[in-house]
Swiss-Prot record:
Family per similarity comment: Belongs to the bacterial ribosomal protein bS20 family.
Location of region: Disordered: 1-20
Biological-process GO terms, alphabetical: translation
A single cellular component GO annotation: small ribosomal subunit
PANTHER family attached to this UniProt entry: 30S RIBOSOMAL PROTEIN S20 (PTHR33398), SMALL RIBOSOMAL SUBUNIT PROTEIN BS20C (PTHR33398:SF1)
Function field: Binds directly to 16S ribosomal RNA.
Keywords: Chloroplast, Plastid, Ribonucleoprotein, Ribosomal protein, RNA-binding, rRNA-binding
Protein name: Small ribosomal subunit protein bS20c
Length: 97
């Protein structure tokens, strides 16, 4: 370990940021999994309003992560696009039944 004070502080800051970033990413992954799992249940009830509310909550968390620099803006866009596509597919599946 370094004895230089600035190097020690820099290491502490990087570890702190790593923990924060990991918790943000974990929260996003958890919300995405919950949303994907709830899509089938909500579409069985034909409740698109609740689906859009849950989708907006996930979008909000992704946008916050992009704003804070945890995710790159392109990665955030890809995640949001994937979620919208999943919702669209599940809605079309319900309409065909």
């Amino acid at each position: 370990m370094s004895k230089n004070v600035s190097a020690i502080k820099k290491n502490q800051v990087s570890l702190r940021n790593k923990r924060k970033n990991k918790s943000y990413k974990s929260a996003i992954k958890t919300l995405i999994k919950k949303y994907i799992n709830s899509l089938d249940e909500l579409m069985d009830l034909n409740n698109t309003y609740v689906c859009t509310l849950k989708l907006s909550a996930v979008y909000k968390k992704i946008d916050q992560a992009v704003r804070k620099g945890v995710l790159h803006k392109n990665q955030g866009s890809r995640k949001k696009s994937m979620l919208a596509k999943a919702m669209k597919i599940s809605i079309s599946r319900i309409k065909t039944i």
